[in-house]
Amino acid sequence: MKRILTSLCALFVCLNIIAQGWPAGYGGVMLQGFYWDSFDDSQWNVLEKKANDFSGYFDLVWVPQSGKAAATKSMGYDPLYYFNQNSSFGTEAELRSMISTFKNKQIGTIADVVINHHGTNNGWFGFPAEVYKGVTYQNLSTDVCADDDGGAAATEARKTGTQLSQNNDEGEGWGGMRD
């Protein structure tokens, strides 16, 4: 019985590995360069100093979202700005320097961005405008899913006379950000 269970477990693990959908022939290794509340350990200049240690072992370093967030200490999942790259992890110049150093060591960089999360700076629907290359971008209340936050957004919209999108959220509800 023990052999059967061990064999089934081994088969299950192998099937899960195959199901991951990795590109054929991919031999790279990615390092997650952050963890929850890793503001000090994941500073751009701290990661950059580790490039020699990473080189030869890791092909990619996965870094936190680099845009300016609503909170001073933020993992980036409450983004206010996508083009302002001064975040809890450092400045835009430090980010660019880290990426350049990684490139020189043949290490790629991949950012953890949850594009449907949007922080606000003035109530539930106060999204700031952002100008990039002469074009102004701004989320509106009509960009917020009709059933966002399990109906809490709709309740707030009714109280303030605000219109939401007619579309429902297709993912899991989460009360931390407007979707």
Give the predicted meaning of each segment.
Residues 3, 17-21:
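Bacterial Sec-dependent N-terminal signal peptides
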Residues 2-10:
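Sec-dependent signal peptide recognition
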Residues 21-52, 56-60, 64-179:
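Substrate-binding/active-site clefts of carbohydrate-active enzymes
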